[in-house]
A protein has these predicted regions:
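N-terminal secretory signal peptides that target proteins for export/translocation
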Residues: 1-9
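Bacterial N-terminal signal peptides
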Residues: 12-21
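N-terminal signal peptide c-region/cleavage motif recognized by signal peptidases
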Residues: 23-25
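C-terminal/domain-edge helix-coil "capping" segments
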Residues: 28-45, 65, 73-74, 102-107, ...
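Second-shell loop/turn segments in exported
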Residues: 48-58, 90-91
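N-terminal, post-signal-peptide region of Sec/Tat-exported proteins
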Residues: 53-85
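Short, solvent-exposed, polar/charged sequence segments at loop or secondary-structure edges
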Residues: 72-115
Length: 179
């Protein structure tokens, strides 16, 4: 009798557990995200006189890689490989091309697209802006930015880390919640 009661209790527990699991909402797949390489707008006198610097070009590539890596690690996005459109993207001015970033992201099957711009005012004063767009509508979801001091790999990395952790991964992408 005791064995039958324990068996019935186990069966009821398993049935209840199965019902709970089946009634739980299904998790949607994370949105597909294309993160393009960052671009530089150099308004400094140094840039006008000396032209492009290889260390800044390297930092631009590292910034895009860092955004991709940190967003992939968050598991909130499914990162897409931009290689199929990368050459075309590099031939465009993504931050001012009238939506070509969205078109490239559509070709990849993305839901969202990120572009980034570093504006160099001087070798001391820079600004990083990251734009997140809805690929289906072309609408800007958010634009996040920060100023940084010092044109070093460390300062760029810290600025990117701040924007990803405190803005892009924040609820509502860091924007105030509607009341």
């Amino acid at each position: 009798m005791l064995i039958a009661r324990v068996t019935i209790m186990k069966a009821l527990f398993i049935a209840a557990l199965l019902m709970l699991m089946m009634s739980a909402p299904a998790r949607a797949d994370p949105p597909k995200l294309a993160v393009f390489d960052f671009e530089l707008i150099d308004t400094s006198l140094e840039g006008e006189v000396n032209g492009p610097r290889t260390d800044e070009h390297d930092r631009l590539m590292q910034a895009g890689d860092q955004v991709r890596r940190e967003l992939a690690e968050s598991a909130r996005f499914q990162l897409l490989d931009i290689a199929p459109v990368n050459a075309a993207a590099h031939g465009s001015n993504l931050q001012a091309c009238g939506g070509c970033d969205v078109q490239y992201a559509q070709r990849l099957g993305a839901d969202l697209a990120i572009t980034g711009v570093v504006q160099k005012v001087s070798n001391l004063i820079l600004n990083i802006t990251i734009y997140l767009r809805d690929v289906h509508t072309g609408d800007l979801v958010t634009a996040v930015n920060t100023d940084l001091r010092g044109n070093t790999s460390e300062s760029w990395s810290r600025a990117v880390r701040y924007l990803v952790r405190n803005r892009l991964l924040a609820p509502n992408y860091g924007a105030p919640q509607p009341q």
